[in-house]
């Protein structure tokens, strides 16, 4: 198990054009929890400011953005470009560690879990899927680092 600082705290981000799902984990337990979603703002700079407010409230030390890599190595989507730009803004405005993490199919997996395992309606799933996707992204990142 890697040693870690007692004050490490992670924010998982599942970016979408309308909503951004959020998840949080902090040392020493690093249990990843969905913490809801925020609406995407009219500009990436405003969206970065909204995220920074949450980062400060929770004393986050590392931000993990889901990065929707294409299934086939072709071209980057406009969403992927926006995520990269938003991640750079957050990094520049906070000087925190910002990581782009492969999130292929995390939103689809979250939707499937909510539909099949939880039996939620489409409206209920819409309200929960973004933060669950962020939870899956952050959990995957933490698992890869063997921080649990």
From Swiss-Prot:
Q: Where in the cell is it found?
A: Cytoplasm
List the SMART domains hit by this protein, alphabetically: YqgFc
Recorded hits in InterPro entries, A to Z, give: RNaseH-like_sf (IPR012337), YqgF (IPR005227), YqgF/RNaseH-like_dom (IPR006641), YqgF/RNaseH-like_dom_sf (IPR037027)
Keyword vocabulary terms for this entry: Cytoplasm, Hydrolase, Nuclease, Ribosome biogenesis
One GO MF term = nuclease activity
Q: Which SUPFAM superfamilies match?
A: Ribonuclease H-like (SSF53098)
EC number annotated for this UniProt entry:
3.1.-.-
* A Gene Ontology cellular-component term: cytosol
Q: Name one GO biological process term.
A: rRNA 5'-end processing
Which protein family is it in?
A: Belongs to the YqgF nuclease family.
Q: Which PANTHER family match?
A: POLYNUCLEOTIDYL TRANSFERASE, RIBONUCLEASE H-LIKE SUPERFAMILY PROTEIN
* Its biological purpose: Could be a nuclease involved in processing of the 5'-end of pre-16S rRNA.
**Protein known as:** Putative pre-16S rRNA nuclease
Q: Which organism is it from?
A: Chlamydia muridarum (strain MoPn / Nigg)
